[in-house]
């Protein structure tokens, strides 16, 4: 029986997940990615929005409201996509993969953490480009943590990144920056 290109891709992706997940056997790696993932649950973004308001007043409030509106759209979008796709998480599909932290929901596609991190970062950087040295590495860490911790496939993270770019771009077009 022939293997389809999609099956080959799924096999490669599963191997990549197993390899990435193996790094969490090291306590420091596991702790680092667990903390990044936990901050990506929302804590980091809520603190950032509050700090923007405190440090930049009305302009910070405007940026924070824009981020919150984009975050709400991201939440509704990814919840709907997860219910529609119903893709099992890597640890549920392959017993060699361990979930090193508890997932927030049942399904894998797309990565909600990544979708939020990328969309929040794009909107925040539109207002405050000088935050890039903080936000870009953190966002990359959130995306990577989802695969390393056994919660997402790389394609979940890549798809979420693409969706987030489209969503953030649409929000910036719909709610343009003040002149």
Regions of interest found by a model, annotated:
Residues 1-47, 62, 78-104:
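N-terminal transmembrane-helix/juxtamembrane module of multi-pass inner/ER membrane proteins
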Residues 27-29, 59-63, 91, 128-134, ...:
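Membrane-helix interface segments
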Residues 35, 50-51, 68, 136-140, ...:
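Residue-level signature of the transmembrane alpha-helical core
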Residues 49-77:
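Interfacial segments of alpha-helical transmembrane regions
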Residues 53, 78-86, 125, 172-176:
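Membrane-water interface at transmembrane helix exits
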Residues 68-82, 133-145:
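Small-polar-interrupted transmembrane alpha-helices in polytopic inner-membrane proteins
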């Amino acid at each position: 029986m022939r293997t389809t290109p999609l099956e080959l891709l799924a096999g490669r992706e599963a191997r990549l997940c197993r390899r990435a997940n193996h790094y969490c056997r090291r306590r420091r790696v596991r702790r680092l990615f667990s903390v990044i993932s936990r901050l990506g649950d929302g804590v980091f973004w809520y603190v950032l929005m509050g700090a923007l308001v405190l440090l930049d007043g009305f302009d910070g409030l405007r940026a924070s409201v824009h981020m919150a509106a984009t975050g709400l759209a991201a939440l509704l979008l990814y919840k709907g996509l997860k219910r529609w796709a119903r893709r099992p998480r890597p640890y549920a599909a392959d017993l060699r993969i361990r979930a090193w932290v508890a997932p927030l929901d049942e399904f894998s596609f797309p990565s909600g953490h990544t979708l939020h991190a990328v969309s929040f970062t794009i909107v925040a950087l539109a207002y405050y480009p000088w935050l890039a040295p903080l936000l870009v590495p953190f966002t990359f860490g959130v995306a990577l943590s989802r695969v390393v911790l056994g919660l997402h496939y790389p394609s979940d993270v890549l798809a979420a990144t693409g969706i987030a770019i489209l969503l953030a771009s649409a929000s910036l077009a719909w709610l343009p920056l003040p002149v």
